[in-house]
Amino acid sequence: MKEVKDFYDKWEPEDFPNYIKLLMNFADELIFEEISLLLKKFENKKDFLVLDCGCGFGAFYNLTKDFNTIYLDISLNLLKRFKLKERKICANILHLPFKDNTFDLVLCINVLEHVNYLKALNEIRRILKNKGKLIVVVVNKDSLIKEEIFNDFKIFHKPLSIKDFEIDGFKIVYSNSVYFLPSIFKISPPIILSKIIEYWKPVDKKLSKIFKNKGQFLIIEMVKE
């Protein structure tokens, strides 16, 4: 975990080339919209205690800002850049500093592919209440798209598949995937790439329905059993 912490302590996405920022923002937008739909059923449960596990600098803060949410990340650098001033904790997902059966919902976006995911899932299960929900997003091992900017990391990085989450203690209640943009488009000048992305978005949604779990990012909702 030290190499993961060190990597994200030096994480400076604003220095990335424009095409990478465009693709990352597009991926985040697709993920955000998908999870927003999953969270709609909890709209009347504002007293839910939620953990955003691996919150980074708060890219997905708007998903959980209306809940009673704690934001956790291993990188102090990222947490310092998170605009929220409170309810932030710097900690390791493999050793979560919470009592058993604490949370109603855990959100874990693009984290498990960088750690011992089974150990992390065991920790998350420990802190979830009975029948508590877990929503995860990971880089998909079974993706039809192999976009290198989401795979070529300088740290441990293991894409995961839906089968990796068929484990004791959790039941999968929903799965889908997003991001089917062909890699060839990234050679386009940024101004053209931004237009391509704009027109591709409805296409991506259609492909997500046709190729349910074959997109670049796998989204899974699980319940603690």
From Swiss-Prot:
Species this protein is from: Methanocaldococcus jannaschii (strain ATCC 43067 / DSM 2661 / JAL-1 / JCM 10045 / NBRC 100440) (Methanococcus jannaschii)
Protein name as catalogued: Uncharacterized protein MJ0638
GO molecular function: methyltransferase activity; S-adenosylmethionine-dependent methyltransferase activity
Pfam families tied to this protein: Methyltransf_11
S-S bridge residues: none
Gene3D superfamilies: Vaccinia Virus protein VP39
InterPro entries (alphabetical): Methyltransf_11, SAM-dependent_MTases_sf
